[in-house]
């Protein structure tokens, strides 16, 4: 069994432990990983970092948590080294001198695009295309804030992705869609940052880091589309309830004294029956107290 297959096997076992909420034997697997020489290529291809990070978040064993943190920290160094090399390559192209500018007559000193980076023996963390460098202070600040949002909870280390590069991609897509850095642009960036940092919606951030949601998609998504699954279900339920209440109010209902309001104890009520489930299931009865406005329902 090759090294990549072995690491992938460990990752799958860790994922099962997280799903079953049973970490028995996890320490042995983490020790195996600690003794393996992990490269950026292996980190990205096996996604073992995400498995270790998920286990760390779920576990209450201090020794296991410490070992998982140690592994993630060591893998983060690989990420930092690659980011540093990428930045050095970006800065490696010297600015032209005044004499060379005079000779060419078309050189832009402020925003000259760097030459394509030379191929390196160190594999790239992401497959996202390069983005143009910007000299706009507002855009650069937005890229920095998006980077911090993507780095929330260190999921980027587990995935093995360059947050600086990915945030630049997202900002570039937002800028191209809006066309300027006015209030609409700033509000768009602010909403991305808020949703990416949301502790109740880690799935959005992980999907962006993994590439399941592309920079082009996250740049134009609405608040409803970025919401967590839990919030989407709540909104869906509220919409259904509002529709039912509207239907009940429109039909007027039937006045009766068969029901007693649990608030004012009066029997002056109006009820409406609505088929909310399949036709062979009992109808849902909605009751409104005509005295105090209290509402309730039952099947």
Curated annotation (Swiss-Prot):
It is found in: Nucleus. GO terms for molecular function: DNA binding; zinc ion binding. CDD domains: TFIIS_I, Zn-ribbon_TFIIS. The modification Phosphoserine is found at residues 59, 100. Residues 95-109 have a biased composition (Polar residues). There is a cross-link at residue 57 (Glycyl lysine isopeptide (Lys-Gly) (interchain with G-Cter in ubiquitin)). Testis specific. Residues 138-254 form the TFIIS central domain. Zn(2+) binds at residues 261, 264, 289, 292. Keywords: DNA-binding, Isopeptide bond, Metal-binding, Nucleus, Phosphoprotein, Transcription, Transcription regulation, Ubl conjugation, Zinc, Zinc-finger. Transmembrane segments: none annotated. Residues 83-126 are annotated as: Disordered. It holds the Pfam family Med26. The keyword Transit peptide does not apply. It comes from the Eukaryota. A zinc finger (TFIIS-type) spans 257-297. GO terms for biological process: positive regulation of transcription by RNA polymerase II; regulation of transcription by RNA polymerase II; transcription elongation by RNA polymerase II. GO terms for cellular component: nucleus. Residues 5-82 form the TFIIS N-terminal domain. Necessary for efficient RNA polymerase II transcription elongation past template-encoded arresting sites. The arresting sites in DNA have the property of trapping a certain fraction of elongating RNA polymerases that pass through, resulting in locked ternary complexes. Cleavage of the nascent transcript by S-II allows the resumption of elongation from the new 3'-terminus. Belongs to the TFS-II family. This is Transcription elongation factor A protein 2. The gene is Tcea2.
